[in-house]
Amino acid sequence: MPARHLALGRLAALAGLFCLAAAGCAAGTPAVVTAHGQPGPRGPAVTGAGTPAAAWTVMPAQLGDTWVYAVDSSVFGKGTETVRITAVKPVAGGQRATMAVSLRLAGSKAPLNFTVQFTDAADGSITFASTSVMGARLTFSSVSWPSPAALTPGRPRTSTITQTGLLGSRTTEHVTITDIGPAAVTVPAGSYQATLLEQTVTASAGSRNAIKTWIVNGIGQVKTETTVVVECKPFASSVQTLTSFTKG
């Protein structure tokens, strides 16, 4: 699931990190949240209709913006994930937004719902504050996407994430983000010229999440591939592709 990451999930990421995600990636492995709307492309993007877009932007956090994704996970099976911006308010230096995520897996009786709060700063950086899943709240410290100016194509950028979860438990992860550069991508929603970002999330326990995310200007995340590695062996994987995007 995204973060919707965030990651996506975890974010992907991170949230940063979401797809494989809010459920904790099963079997006690670290959750991956892929943050939707990670930094967009550095050059002109191409919409599904082939129209060049203006200079790239970070996540289009407008009230009512809605993304629908097809999810195919080796752990959870196939499903559909809907992500919607449900609240936006101005704050010092940017805006604070709330994102509602609903993941419905094939054969499940009810969807898995969770929310993410983040701040979209004027410089293009995004900072995640918390994620709420099934009544449980996970808070973050130093969890953010750097501003576009801070990402240099081909040069990895590393940061540290601290998460506080149930019963005050704290975990630390090291996140490396690399802007690979322009990349063409085709998903059910259309064909796009995107920016490909690669993330590596390493937990203190030794597990590692490898995340590839294709970002399109004005839309955000259109495709995410996540692989969870435990003890140097692939443990789980997921692919998330955009089927539709509706502006609020």
Language model: regions and residue ranges:
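Solvent-exposed helix/loop surface patches that form functional interfaces
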Residues: 120-192
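Solvent-exposed, flexible loop/coil residues
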Residues: 5, 62-63, 144, 149, ...
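C-terminal motif of bacterial Sec signal peptides marking the signal peptidase cleavage site
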Residues: 21-24
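Acidic, serine/threonine-rich low-complexity disordered tracts
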Residues: 26-115, 163-248
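Solvent-exposed, charged interface segments at domain starts and junctions
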Residues: 15, 102-133
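Bacterial N-terminal signal peptides that target proteins for export
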Residues: 2-15
